[in-house]
Amino acid sequence: MAQKERSERDERESEFVDRLVHINRVAKVVKGGRRFGFAALVVVGDQKGRVGFGHGKAREVPEAVRKATESAKRGMIYVPLRSGRTLHHDLEGHHGAGRVLLRSASAGTGIIAGGPMRAIFETLGMQDVVAKSLGSSNPYNMVRATFDALKRQMHPRDIAAQRGIKYSTLQARRQHLVDAEG
């Protein structure tokens, strides 16, 4: 019975893709010298619009990564994607001194982003996006700022409802702008 439950849990967890973003060696000074530990930052996603990040600390690297992965799975968010590949609109996110700018991109552009942001977009399942990090380059700040931006994204249906207009009207305006650009 326990074997069956364990295999079912492993199948559910195998649907997630995880990326190690950053490992930091930390030291605690004690009477006998220094006691070393590790802190890990991990991003986990299902490549279908759900993503989360986690921070784990332990005396050994694998244990820190495991704790960070568990934390990331507990704090996952859903991000609506346009055509399953990019953002619905441009976004900006902040955390501390970190600021990120995320822009939707046309098909075939790819993921143009650096470091921690690239890991987030890959695990999220996003295929076309342009991202720029402004301010702090600390991986923790960049990840939190990116998540802040992703949480601000709204589906066009929600925007139309908020403005009190029809979804089709909003789509027509968007198409008009796309035609004017091209």
Swiss-Prot record:
A molecular function annotated in GO for this UniProt entry is: rRNA binding
Identify the residues that the record assigns to the S5 DRBM domain, covering every copy: 16-79
What Gene3D superfamilies has UniProt attached to this entry?
A: 3.30.160.20, 3.30.230.10
Question: Which InterPro entries does the record cross-reference, listed alphabetically?
Answer: Ribosomal_Su5_D2-typ_SF, Ribosomal_uS5, Ribosomal_uS5_bac-type, Ribosomal_uS5_C, Ribosomal_uS5_N, Ribosomal_uS5_N_CS, Ribsml_uS5_D2-typ_fold_subgr
Q: Which PROSITE patterns match?
A: RIBOSOMAL_S5, S5_DSRBD
| GO biological process, alphabetically ordered | translation
What keywords are annotated for this sequence in UniProt?
Ribonucleoprotein, Ribosomal protein, RNA-binding, rRNA-binding
Give one Pfam hit by family name: Ribosomal_S5
Keyword presence, Hydrolase: no
Q: Which GO terms describe its cellular component?
A: small ribosomal subunit
NCBIfam families found in the cross-reference section:
rpsE_bact (TIGR01021)
UniProt subunit comment: Part of the 30S ribosomal subunit. Contacts proteins S4 and S8.
Q: Which family does it belong to?
A: Belongs to the universal ribosomal protein uS5 family.
Any notes on this protein's domains? Answer: The N-terminal domain interacts with the head of the 30S subunit; the C-terminal domain interacts with the body and contacts protein S4. The interaction surface between S4 and S5 is involved in control of translational fidelity.
| Function text | With S4 and S12 plays an important role in translational accuracy.
What name is this protein filed under?
Small ribosomal subunit protein uS5
Which species is this UniProt entry from? Bartonella henselae (strain ATCC 49882 / DSM 28221 / CCUG 30454 / Houston 1)
